[in-house]
Each structure stands twice: as structure tokens, then as C-alpha cells.
Curated annotation (Swiss-Prot):
Biological process terms in GO annotation: anterograde synaptic vesicle transport; axonal transport of mitochondrion; JNK cascade; regulation of JNK cascade; regulation of terminal button organization; retrograde synaptic vesicle transport
Taxonomic path: Eukaryota, Metazoa, Ecdysozoa, Arthropoda, Hexapoda
Stated name of the protein: JNK-interacting protein 1
GO cellular component annotations of the record: axon; axon cytoplasm
SMART domains the UniProt entry points to: PTB, SH3
Skewed-composition ranges (Polar residues): 231-249
Domain of life: Eukaryota
Keyword annotations from UniProtKB, A to Z: Cytoplasm, Developmental protein, SH3 domain
Stated role: The JNK-interacting protein (JIP) group of scaffold proteins selectively mediates JNK signaling by aggregating specific components of the MAPK cascade to form a functional JNK signaling module. May function as a regulator of vesicle transport, through interactions with the JNK-signaling components and motor proteins.
Region described as Disordered: spans on this chain: 1-71, 213-254
PID domain mapped to chain residues: 344-479
């Protein structure tokens, strides 16, 4: 059976009358379009294998059109079988196949018609004036051992009216189509300025989350993850973290930090006195923390129980929190074990004035003093901003902004200290908590005076701080005046 198939396959090649019949001329081949249909049944690369079942009229028109154009390299592959079969028609009219013995098995074509169509294509493409086709060339090309490269998969054509979705979001009306960009070789038709701006836009889209502030722990993207820590180091503080975590609204404002807890806004840094120095460098990791360098002058306003301090870095003018271990007191008393530590609480208030009183205690006495001083200033008293420092030793009023002002508007420098044993009473106004006053006694004469202050918020924390100082002072006084150690010794 194999011998008969071989003889049937090679019969059109070795019989010379078949060549004479096909090499008669170009005019005779135009009248036989069936040879072209038999040779290339799947010539259209984009059509499926089932396109061979279409009408003969469309196939005839395609076959005749192939004769009018220049001969090109064509490849036919059986996509349905997937066996890698390839039939190549080169520009010189030669036929190449990967597997000549399998080709007649998969394609139910007449071998004689195929060879006739191939020879007719060669003679008609040359206009009938070319030399006769040799048999040896055909037998070499039809050999089963002929090597041929596999045709690469054809990619879909780039649509010309399709624009990039990213360019559309970036204002893609100014950009061309994708086909024009590839045709111009990477945007040759686009101005360099537009291309550079386009690259920057792509960079911001891909890496925008690295520079954007929405990547912070307070952003909506982080909050959408669920139960995530906000990142504030004061969130677990026993004190009110809202007051200890001021948010900076505008970095270019004249006062870069909001008012502190129980104080007025910091208008000038000169009025603040440095209480601590930076001992180590501290790099902030959250919004409510401030940066510290070694030797920075720091005004510590409050120290929480979790060993975090709230204060102002006088070098940078920023207010926030920082660990207490990164700052040291200016007196360096912490290094002296014999010196007892003194707790100090500082508040920024507006000093309105002092009036003499007849009694040494009572809320009514403070209200009467406030009414008298506010009546002199009017409905909106301003006062002189100063720092009220509360400690176990006493109350200190400090204001160092006077010498730095102009001579015309120069105010007296305030630096007064009242020993706690001479302070008899302290209370805030029951109706308006912004006003507070404390009564002091003259050291040698039986006379009393009430000192009135005003804060931007409620002054209840100031009164409570004075009350705690009284308790500590009284405890020390009892231990000194009535020692209990002597009782156990006896």
C-alpha cells in the first residue's frame, strides 16, 4: 500500500507530459482557478480552518487576486490538528513543507492538482516569459527531511482608534492612539515636554502612595484595614491624649502649634523659658511627636505618668510629646542622689493684675477680685502673658518677653515667686472657668492680695495642680513637724 501511494505521489513529477500540460502559458492557467484553491485552501491567516467550506466564488476571487500581486512568502498551518504542519510558498515560487508524507493525509487534496497549481503559479507570476521549471528543484523542496522554522503566532493588530485608559484619565485627548505611538518609535510625534510630563504622571500613579500623606496611620486607607492602631504614641496614655496630641493645621502660620492644655496660644517663643536640655537625639515617628537634638532647649509643660513629656522645642518652635528619658533638667539634679526631685507643672496664662483683699480665703473673695479687675479692663481683658509654674516650693510667675519688645510698648518683666506656705487659697471663677485667682499673705504684715489670671480654656487643671502641690507640701510638713520614727524608737 505504501509503494502504491509513493508512486501515486511522485507520478506527476516523473512524467514529462504533466509538465508540458502546465507550462503551456499564463493564459491557460487563469482559466483554471481550481488549482489555486487546491494549493492554498487556508491562505487567509486570520480565518479559521472552517473557512474552506465557504462558497467557490469567494475562493476563486481570492485565488485570482494572488496572481495579480507580487509573490510573497506565505505559510499555511493546520491549527485544528496542532501538529505543526507548515506549507511555505516562497517568493521564487518554490513550495516548502515540514512533513510531505503527512500533508496529503491531513489535507484531502489531489496531489496532481497541487503540483499543477504550484507550477501554474510560477509561470503565471512571471507573465509566461520565464524559463521552464526544472523537476529537480521540486523534488528537493518536497523532500521529507527539509528543515523549516516554525511560524510564530500572529499577534492581534493594534486598534487605531483605541486609546489608553491611563492616558484618558490623565487627559488623553492630547495624546495619539497606541498605534501612532508605536509607529513613531516611542512617541516621536509627541513633544518632549509632553513626554516628560507623561512619564512623571506614570510615576505618580505607580508610586504615589509612597509620597502621599494618605499613607499615614490616620489616613482612610489605613482605617479601612480594620482594627489598626492609629499610631499615636499617646493613645494608651492614662491622660487625655487629645489635649496632649495637638495637630498642626498650617506649617506656615505665624504660630506653628496650637494652644497647650489649659493655656493661651504661644505667640512668641522668647517668653518661654528653657526647663530641659536634649540629652539624646529623638526622631519622631508620629504626628504628635517632636524632633530633639542633643543640647536643644526644651520647655516642658507637662510630664505624664507613662514617662512621656509634652513641651516645646525652642530651637524649632514645634510643640508635641517626646520621651522623658531623652531630656534632662537644666539643674542636672537627677545626677545628684542627695537632691530630691521636685515636680513642676507649668501653664501659660494671661496675668490681669493683683488687688488687695480683706479675707485670706473664699470663692467669693476671688469672684470679687475678678469683678473689680475685669471692670477696669472692660468686657475683653487681654492681660500680659506669663508662665505660672506650680511646684512643691511655691508658685512662680515668669515673663521674659518684656525686654525684647519696643521701648514704646515695653512692659515690666515679671519674675515673682510666692512660697507655698504664704499661699492661702486658690480657686477658679464658678461662672467663667477661664478666670482663676490665688490669695497670698504678706510675709511680715497681716495683709492679703489676690492675683487674677485668665486662660484660653478652663483653668480647672491649674487649680487642681495647686491643690496637689498643697497636699504634697502638707505631707512633708507633717513628716517634719511630727516625725513618727521617734515613736518606734522609744
Amino acid at each position: 500500500m505504501a509503494d502504491s501511494e509513493f508512486e501515486e505521489f511522485h507520478r506527476p513529477i516523473f512524467e514529462p507530459h504533466t509538465i508540458a500540460g502546465f507550462g503551456s502559458g499564463a493564459g491557460s492557467k487563469k482559466n483554471n482557478p481550481h488549482a489555486f484553491y487546491s494549493l492554498i485552501p487556508n491562505d487567509d491567516l486570520e480565518d479559521s480552518h472552517s473557512s474552506k467550506s465557504d462558497g467557490d466564488g469567494s475562493d476563486q476571487e481570492d485565488g485570482i487576486g494572488l496572481v495579480d500581486h507580487e509573490p510573497k512568502m506565505r505559510q499555511v498551518e493546520d491549527d485544528e490538528l496542532g501538529d505543526g504542519l507548515k506549507v511555505t510558498l516562497s517568493s521564487d515560487g518554490s513550495l516548502d513543507t515540514n512533513d510531505s508524507f503527512n500533508s496529503h493525509r491531513h489535507h484531502p487534496l489531489n496531489h496532481q492538482d497541487a503540483i499543477g497549481g504550484f507550477l501554474g503559479m510560477d509561470t503565471s507570476g512571471l507573465g509566461g516569459n520565464s524559463a521552464p521549471v526544472t523537476i529537480g528543484a521540486s523534488t528537493d523542496l518536497l523532500a521529507p527531511n527539509t528543515a523549516a522554522t516554525r511560524r510564530r503566532r500572529k499577534l492581534p493588530e493594534i486598534p487605531k482608534n483605541k486609546k489608553s485608559s491611563i492616558l484618558h484619565l490623565l487627559g488623553g485627548s492630547n495624546f495619539g492612539s497606541l498605534a501612532d505611538e508605536f509607529r513613531n518609535g516611542g512617541g516621536g510625534g509627541i513633544p518632549p515636554a509632553v513626554r516628560s510630563g507623561q512619564q512623571r504622571s506614570f510615576l505618580s500613579l505607580k508610586c504615589g502612595y509612597l509620597m502621599d500623606e494618605d499613607s499615614s496611620p490616620d489616613s482612610e486607607r489605613m482605617q479601612s484595614l480594620g482594627d489598626v492602631d492609629s499610631g499615636h504614641s499617646t493613645a494608651h496614655s492614662p491622660n487625655d491624649f487629645k489635649s496632649m496630641s495637638p495637630q498642626i493645621t498650617s506649617p506656615v502660620s505665624q504660630s506653628p502649634f496650637p494652644p497647650p492644655f489649659g493655656g493661651v496660644p504661644f505667640g512668641q517663643l522668647e517668653m518661654l523659658e528653657a526647663t530641659h536640655r536634649g540629652l539624646h537625639k529623638f526622631v519622631p515617628r508620629h504626628h504628635d511627636e517632636i524632633e530633639l537634638e542633643i543640647g536643644d532647649a526644651i520647655y516642658v509643660q507637662k510630664e505624664a505618668e507613662d514617662l512621656w513629656c509634652e513641651g516645646v522645642n525652642l530651637r524649632t518652635g514645634r510643640q508635641g510629646i517626646f520621651p522623658s528619658a531623652y531630656a534632662v533638667d537644666l539643674d542636672y539634679n537627677e545626677f545628684d542622689p542627695t537632691v530630691q526631685l521636685v515636680k513642676k507643672e507649668r501653664y501659660l496664662l494671661g496675668y490681669l493684675g493683683s488687688v488687695e483683699t480683706l479675707a485670706h480665703k473664699g470663692t467669693g473673695v476671688v469672684c470679687q477680685a475678678v469683678r473689680k479687675i475685669v471692670g477696669e479692663y472692660g468686657n475683653s481683658p487681654t492681660g500680659q502673658t506669663c508662665i505660672l509654674e506650680v511646684s512643691d516650693q511655691g508658685l512662680r510667675m515668669v515673663d521674659r518677653s518684656g525686654p525684647n519688645q519696643n521701648k514704646k510698648d515695653k512692659k515690666p518683666c515679671i519674675d515673682y515667686f510666692y512660697s507655698l506656705k504664704n499661699v492661702s487659697f486658690c480657686a477658679f471663677h464658678p461662672r467663667d472657668h477661664r478666670f482663676i485667682g490665688f490669695i497670698t499673705k504678706h510675709p511680715t504684715v497681716q495683709r492679703f492680695a489676690c492675683h487674677v489670671f485668665k486662660g484660653s480654656e478652663s483653668t480647672r487643671p491649674v487649680a487642681e495642680a495647686v491643690g496637689r502641690a498643697f497636699q504634697r507640701f502638707y505631707q512633708k510638713f507633717i513628716e517634719t513637724a511630727y516625725p513618727i520614727e521617734d515613736i518606734y524608737i522609744e
